[in-house]
Amino acid sequence: SELGAGTRGASMGVDALKIAAIDLKSDYFRKYDEVEISDENWLLLENVKFKYAKRIRGIMKIYERLSKSVGRIMKKQAAYPIVLSGDHSTAGGTIAGIKSAYPEERLGVIWIDAHADLHSPYTTPSGNMHGMPLAAALGEDNLEMKTNELDEKTVELWDKLKNSGGIVPKIEYRDLVYIGVRDTEE
């Protein structure tokens, strides 16, 4: 999916990796089972309904699908899935799935990105959800840095997104490690 990004093209990354593997004569994508999660990219053709949480309804659907799939794989197969996706708004669904498989365990996250991705609809300058997955996983609104006034529906949808998988928070700040961050989005 690329619903969370402000520019297009991220959802083509997985296919680009597969083509590169073929060119390199790698059997990587043949030797492991693949589960494809349907995206909601058709929503890119629709008008944005929530200025500070663009396409949040579609992202919620992806979170739910991804969370269920990751949780099921980890519980039933005792395997660790490798999730290849488009923009990183979907990382929240992966985190929710891992937490659902291990609800009593602390979950650590290593975040490799130029941005901290701790925005919420209350703080986002763009409304793009790819800047919010860690805030959602942390159950964080960041109200002390609030710059946006939200309508009731946006608040309701954001609260539902944070509650994906039924556990809030999914991670704690002390279990979060950043690599490559140059913008902490103060």
Task: Please give the residue ranges for each predicted region.
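Conserved alpha-helical scaffold segments that buttress catalytic/binding sites
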Residues: 1-186
